[in-house]
Regions:
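Metal-dependent catalytic neighborhoods of phosphoester/phosphodiester hydrolases
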Residues: 63-72, 88-98
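Core dinuclear metal-dependent hydrolase active-site scaffold
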Residues: 1-49, 109-146
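Surface-exposed, flexible loop/turn segments at secondary-structure boundaries
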Residues: 61, 86, 138
């Protein structure tokens, strides 16, 4: 197993590899200064399939490279906070403005009922298991904690 954490200035992006050719992406921010994008990076490494995209919160800097990730790779599943509906994200973001990455994520979530999970999840990666938890919208005022 290998975890690469990338410099995306503000935000987050990490790629988890099982050592057998399967990867998952934890957040998909990009680096505006260098032009680094997660999907282009993976494609340049010869990786075209992403087992899962794990979105840790609904801030733009955590998903600013999502469109590139979807354009350059086949993302099999998105794991996100399922307690937060796409409509609620749009409502919360109406106060501060919704960036293109969040808009893409919300649109993808609206088109698929099969994304996300709570509890133990199997991404089909050798030797890697993870458990998903989420915060409830009623417990927080901002999307950074959702």
């Amino acid at each position: 197993m290998r975890l690469n954490i990338f410099d995306v200035e503000h935000g987050a992006c990490a790629i988890l590899s099982d050592g057998y050719g399967k990867v998952s992406v934890i957040d998909c921010g990009h680096n505006a200064t260098t032009g680094w994008l997660p999907g282009s990076y993976l494609r340049n490494q010869g990786i075209t399939d992403v087992q899962g995209l794990i979105v840790t919160n609904y801030d733009e800097d955590h998903v600013s490279g999502i469109r590139n990730l979807f354009q350059q790779t086949n993302v099999h599943r998105i794991y996100r906070n399922m307690a937060v509906s796409p409509g609620l994200v749009r409502y919360i973001k109406s106060e501060t403005g919704m960036g293109p990455g969040i808009d893409f994520l919300v649109s993808s979530a609206q088109q698929s009922s099969g994304y996300g999970t709570v509890g133990y999840a199997d991404m089909g990666m050798h030797g890697i298991e993870f458990e998903v938890f989420h915060n409830l919208p009623s417990e927080f005022d901002d999307e950074n904690n959702l």
